[in-house]
C-alpha cells in the first residue's frame, strides 16, 4: 500500500531486528473484521555457486478472526521469514515471496500495511527516551502526528501504559528497566496503534521463566480487552498450548505445513487443564512432529 516500515531511529527501514510500525496511508480501524491470507507462498534464495535454495514450499494459510495463532517449527525452517511476509517486511534486494501472494482484507500486501504491526524478541526501545516517549514514538512520525489530535494520542498512550502496568515508570529511561519491562514497552508501543493484526516473533524467548509467564498472562488480558488477530512465532510448545487458539507446525526446509489444529479450551488455561489428557495429547502431537524434523537443528522448549 506504499507505506513505510520505520524503526526507532525514524529511518525508513525493513530491518527485521526492530519493531516495524507502519504509516497510515489509509484509515486503520479497530474492527475485529479482518482477513489475512497466504496463497501458495514459495521463497527461494539464489546461491552464487549452485541452484537456488527453497526455504518455503507452497504454504497457504487463512486467518479471518481475532484469534491467537501459534507458529512452530524447527530452527531455521522459515517461520520468521513467513511472519515478515505477513507484515510486508521484505529483505533488501530479494524478491519476497518468490511466488504466491499475501492478502490483507482482500488487497495484495506488497509492503508494510496499515493494519499490521510487528513485535520482535529484540524490543528496540531507545535508551535516550523515557518509557512514555518510547510508547508515544509512532505519533512523532509525520503521518501519524497529522492523523491524531494531540489529546487523543496522549490519552491512548496513558491508557496503554496503565494496561501494561508501567504508569509509575513512564518518566524512567528504558535503560533503567528490566528485560520484561522493556518488552512491556514494546508491546504497548505496538498496541497503542490499535492494529487489527499483531505479528510477534518470539517476543518472550529471551525472558526468564517467571517474567515470560507474566508476559503471557498480560498478552491474554490485552487480547481479551482489545481483540486482534495475532500470529505468534515460538519454540516453546507449552507456550503454544497456553496461548493459542490455533497451532500451526512447519516442517524443515523447504517448509510445508506439517500440522494445523485448533484448541477450544478458553483462556486463561488452568494448570489442571495443562495436565489433562487433552493437553498432554496435543503436546505429544506437536513434539512428535518437531522431533521428526529437528534432529540436530536446534532446541525445542517445553516449560513445566
Could you describe each region identified by the protein language model?
Residues 72-74:
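The feature captures the beta-strand-to-loop junction immediately N-terminal to the Walker
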Residues 87:
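Helix-to-loop junction immediately C-terminal to a conserved catalytic motif
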Residues 97-111:
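Conserved ABC transporter NBD signature motif
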Residues 129-138:
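Short coil-to-helix segment of the ABC ATPase nucleotide-binding domain corresponding to the Q-loop/switch region
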Residues 140, 148-169, 221:
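Conserved ABC ATPase "signature" region
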Residues 173-177, 181:
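Conserved ABC ATPase signature
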Residues 192-196:
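A short, proline-enriched helix->beta-strand linker immediately N-terminal to the Walker B motif
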